[in-house]
Amino acid sequence: MITEKKILKFRDLSLNKLKLMVKEVRNQKSIEERNVVSFSKNFTLSLSNYCQNQCGYCFYNHHIPKSGKDENRALIESEEIHDLIDKGIRYRCKEALLMSGENPGKFEIVQKKLKEMNFDRFIDFIVHISSLLLDNDILPHTNIGVLPYEELKELKKFNASMGLMLESTSQKLFQQGGVHEYSPSKAPSIRINHIKNAGKLKIPFTTGLLIGIGEKFKDRVNALYTLKEIHNQFGHIQEVILQNFVYKKGIPYLPDKHLKIEELLKITGVARLIFGNEIPIQVPPNLIKGYEKDFLELGIDDFGGISPLTIDYINPSKPWPMIEELDQICSRSGFHLKERLPIYDKFINKEGFISENIKKKLQSIN
């Protein structure tokens, strides 16, 4: 367990000092890997906005009125799935992110749509889409909230990797007026259990923190150490995302004070010191425009999924950067941008971490 003294030591580090310490960590990598920053060219299948939680910061939730590309839907139509797959093939995307609200199948309107499409359960719908993607040489990465162990086990057969944000370990967020007041399954114990179950099943896993939703610096550090302990036990966390909160019109949550970029930079550097070179750190590039060089110097080595054809459904007002533009920024900053798959290389040959379905597809994709 992290001590208060250690947290204070991290807090008191200047950004310049952190950059020097991060450089020392990075220099422990081989020369070939030292300045490589990865990304995955992907597209998103936004399956359903219906969600059993009502997080105060969430714009994606079906309770928030929307129109246009990010309009609410009970269930994505079959025609749109096929259209996006066709476009994904044309753009040479190797990953499809399957996302939805949590447990949309509990809502009657979603159940009705599933029945119309001949599916008994939402998970059957996910398996169907994942199989369809694999048939088209696109690797699925599913992030649809907390799932039972058996459903995780089923999805592993058809997914290259999966994800669930820890978000925070702060209990304060569940108090009256907190962002998780009406979100019972955002309890840290429930999400930690899900992440551990993924570890037991040897699923290459993406997780991370939401920064600026009412938590304190010490909460961020505690959450990072929680993820480190889980990874030390199971070895399955392939990347940690540090995602800053961005305000959107219509959401209930209005922070007392807005997150400063320096706060995000600091926790990024601290995360690199905590994880060393064991786990890649990602900050979404569309949320840090103009500060990419600073984040590179403070330890990020991944930009995550970047889509040439679908929006960021969580932050629809923040367009993805052009890959060519990001490549130029990296080059000017002394880094090399490199495309990756939704499963990191080290997990491909790691015993038990990919199913036979995925193994076959990796051979044809590579």
Where are these regions (language model features)?
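Short, composition-biased local secondary-structure segments
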Residues: 56, 97-101, 117-127, 167, ...
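Canonical Radical SAM [4Fe-4S] cluster-binding loop centered on the CxxxCxxC motif
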Residues: 37-80, 103
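Short, well-ordered alpha-helical
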Residues: 4, 8, 13-49
